[in-house]
C-alpha cells in the first residue's frame, strides 16, 4: 500500500492505494502551525478508524503548494512511517513535458493533475481544478503541458465580497432557479455561481481555440476540486468530473519513481 498526500492552501487530502485501487481517503485542514506529532496523532486516528496499520504502508508521495508545512509533514512521515517520502518537484519523473517559460513556476498540483489526466484520457485536455485558486491547464495528446490560467477560487471571491461589503451577508453557495432574484441572499448566490460558470465557459472556449490553432484536436475538458460538481451543472464546457484526479496523479508518479 502507498500513502499519497495532496497539500493545498486550504486542505490536505490523504489517500491510501492498494495497487491501483483507492481504498481510503480523508481531508484535513492545512495548518502550518501544527507540529509533526500533531499531524501524526491525526493520521493515527484515521488509520485506526479504517483498521489500517502504519506497517501496511510501503511508500509515501507528497504534492504541496505550501512550502511552510513541509518540514512538519516530512518529519511526521519519517517518525511514524520510517519512510523517506517522494516530494513532487524538480528531478521527479512525471512523463510531462513542461512548456512554461520557467518550468519551476508550475505548481505541483497542476503537474500532478496533468499526469493523471494524460494517463486516463490519452487525448488533448483542458483540466480545471476548483481549489483555493481555480486553475485551467492545457495539455496535448503528446503530454506537453502548454500552460494555462489561474483565477481566484470561488471561496476566495465570495469571502472578498462579504469582507468588503458590510451590508452583504455570508451565504451558502447553492444554485438558484434563475438570475432574476427577489432577495439579497439569492442574488449573491446566483451572481457567484452563474458568474463563475460563465467565466469557466469563456476561458475554456478561448483555450480550446488556442489549442486548435496550434494543431490540436478539440480538447476534452475534465474538472476536479470541491466546487466542480456545482459549477459543472451550469457550465456548458465541462465534459467530465474526476473527484480523485490529483490522488490518481500522485499514484502514477509514485509508480514512475519507486
UniProtKB/Swiss-Prot annotation:
CDD domains: ASKHA_NBD_PanK-III. One of its GO terms (molecular function) is metal ion binding. ATP binds at residues 6-13, 132. One of its GO terms (cellular component) is cytoplasm. It is found in: Cytoplasm. Pfam families: Pan_kinase (PF03309). Its cofactor is NH4(+); K(+). Keywords: ATP-binding, Coenzyme A biosynthesis, Cytoplasm, Kinase, Metal-binding, Nucleotide-binding, Potassium, Transferase. A monovalent cation. Ammonium or potassium. The active site is at residue 109. Substrate binds at residues 100, 107-110, 184. One of its GO terms (biological process) is coenzyme A biosynthetic process. K(+) binds at residue 129. It comes from the Bacteria. It catalyses: (R)-pantothenate + ATP = (R)-4'-phosphopantothenate + ADP + H(+). Its EC number is 2.7.1.33. Belongs to the type III pantothenate kinase family. Homodimer. Catalyzes the phosphorylation of pantothenate (Pan), the first step in CoA biosynthesis. This is Type III pantothenate kinase. It comes from Clostridium botulinum (strain Loch Maree / Type A3).
Amino acid at each position: 500500500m502507498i500513502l499519497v498526500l495532496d497539500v493545498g492552501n486550504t486542505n490536505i487530502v490523504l489517500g491510501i492505494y492498494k495497487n491501483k485501487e483507492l481504498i481510503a481517503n480523508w481531508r484535513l485542514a492545512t495548518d502550518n502551525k501544527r507540529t509533526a506529532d500533531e499531524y501524526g496523532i491525526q493520521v493515527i486516528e484515521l488509520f485506526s478508524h479504517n483498521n489500517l496499520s502504519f506497517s501496511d504502508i510501503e511508500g509515501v508521495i507528497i504534492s504541496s503548494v505550501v512550502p511552510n508545512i513541509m518540514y512538519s509533514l516530512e518529519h511526521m512521515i519519517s517518525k511514524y512511517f520510517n519512510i523517506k517520502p517522494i516530494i513532487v518537484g524538480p528531478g521527479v519523473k512525471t512523463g510531462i513535458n513542461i512548456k512554461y517559460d520557467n518550468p519551476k513556476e508550475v505548481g505541483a498540483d497542476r503537474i500532478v493533475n496533468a499526469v493523471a489526466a494524460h494517463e486516463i484520457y490519452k487525448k488533448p485536455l483542458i483540466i480545471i481544478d476548483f481549489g483555493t485558486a481555480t486553475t485551467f491547464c492545457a495539455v496535448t495528446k503528446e503530454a506537453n503541458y502548454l500552460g494555462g490560467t489561474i483565477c481566484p477560487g470561488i471561496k476566495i471571491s465570495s469571502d472578498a465580497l462579504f469582507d468588503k461589503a458590510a451590508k452583504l451577508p455570508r451565504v451558502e453557495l447553492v444554485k438558484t432557479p434563475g438570475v432574476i432574484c427577489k432577495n439579497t441572499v439569492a442574488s449573491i448566490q446566483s451572481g457567484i455561481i452563474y458568474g463563475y460558470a460563465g467565466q469557466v465557459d469563456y476561458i475554456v472556449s478561448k483555450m480550446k481555440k488556442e489549442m486548435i490553432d496550434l494543431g490540436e484536436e478539440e480538447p476534452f475538458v475534465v474538472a476536479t476540486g470541491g466546487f466542480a460538481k456545482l459549477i459543472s451543472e451550469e457550465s456548458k464546457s465541462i465534459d467530465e468530473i474526476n473527484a480523485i484526479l490529483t490522488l490518481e496523479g500522485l499514484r502514477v508518479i509514485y509508480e514512475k519513481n519507486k
